[in-house]
Amino acid sequence: MIDRVSFIEMSARQRAQFLLDKGTYRELLGPFDSIMSPWLLDQNVVPQADDGMVVARGTINGKNSVVIAIEGAFQGGSMGEVSGAKMAAALELAAEDCRAGKPVQVVLCLETGGVRLQEANLGLAAIADIHAAIMDVRRYVPVIGIVAGTVGCFGGMSIAAGLCSYLIVTREARLGLNGPQVIEQEAGVQEYDSKNKPFIWQMTGGEIRSRIGLADYFSKDDAEEIKKAVSNFIDKGNPKEFRTDRYEEYLERVSNFDTSKQADTRVILSLFKQ
């Protein structure tokens, strides 16, 4: 019998409520405000009242905090104009508070396939705003990302995950710039079989991402363990060096890779050996 609470099985709203101190949860632009995407109905897609994005203010260990959680169950957590604007604006407001001497801790729950195809360039523009806002606010407080599963984090939002000060992943998580189906479509099934689940998790799963240094904490699907990791990273403050500061090192490693050979877990581990 499992004696722990699953973080993966929580909705975005439940995740935000769980991470914030009890009784402090206050949602901004929630479902009753009906800030919905204006583009989906015309494409025969039923919109959601919060556009799949939960922004909640409260405290974590008594410190003012904002938790921004993507609902992976709505359109695969895809980022549209409204949902992207909600996240970007929340990050920008947190940065403004920090500059005013009122630091706000930032936690991102990332379950997303990337840009929402029905909104195309509007979603891409929103993701660019999110990247800029993360870079801004992380100068003052750590930005803590969580990729728990089962959607994973792909596309432009995987870059957002890489910009976070700290990243928490589970075994069920996946993290990659392109999703399995996209790679298979472009490179062929012999290069990347999207139906081969063990292979997919060996290449992009939370465990391998943690082992090669692209994530900072590898957790069980245990809500309390994840909450404790968030608390510890908040207390720790920003790292001395962000992953993005090491971009030249990563580029050199990738440029020296022989792309004529099929990559596997062993190759990835040797390529990104710490």
Language-model-derived ranges and their functions:
Residues 51, 80-102:
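A short, well-ordered alpha-helical element
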